[in-house]
Regions:
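Short, charged, surface-exposed hinge/linker loops at domain edges
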Residues: 1-8, 37-67
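Amphipathic, hydrophobic secondary-structure cores in small proteins
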Residues: 15-38, 47
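Short aromatic-glycine-(Arg/Gly/Cys) micro-motifs in beta-strand/loop hairpins
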Residues: 3, 8-20
C-alpha cells in the first residue's frame, strides 16, 4: 500500500529539512534527495504498527504580505 504525503523542504545552514505537513514527521539530509529519502523512511517507521488515518485534503499555496 502507498499513500501520498505533502512535504515541505527548507535549507537550514548546511542541511535540508523535510517535514510532512499531514503529521509533522520530519527528517534531514545533506541534499534534498537525502532529506526526502530519510523522511520516507521516518514515515514508514511512524506508520509501521498502525493503519493510516484518513487525512483531510491539504492545499499548499503562497501569499504576498506587505511588510
Amino acid at each position: 500500500m502507498s499513500k501520498s504525503f505533502t512535504i515541505a523542504i527548507q535549507k537550514e545552514d548546511d542541511w535540508y529539512v523535510a517535514k510532512c505537513l499531514e503529521n509533522s514527521v520530519a527528517s534531514q539530509g545533506k541534499t534534498m534527495d537525502e532529506a526526502t529519502d530519510n523522511l520516507r523512511e521516518a514515515l514508514m517507521l511512524y506508520y509501521e504498527d498502525e493503519s493510516l488515518p484518513i487525512f483531510p485534503q491539504t492545499y499548499v499555496t503562497t501569499m504576498e504580505v506587505a511588510l
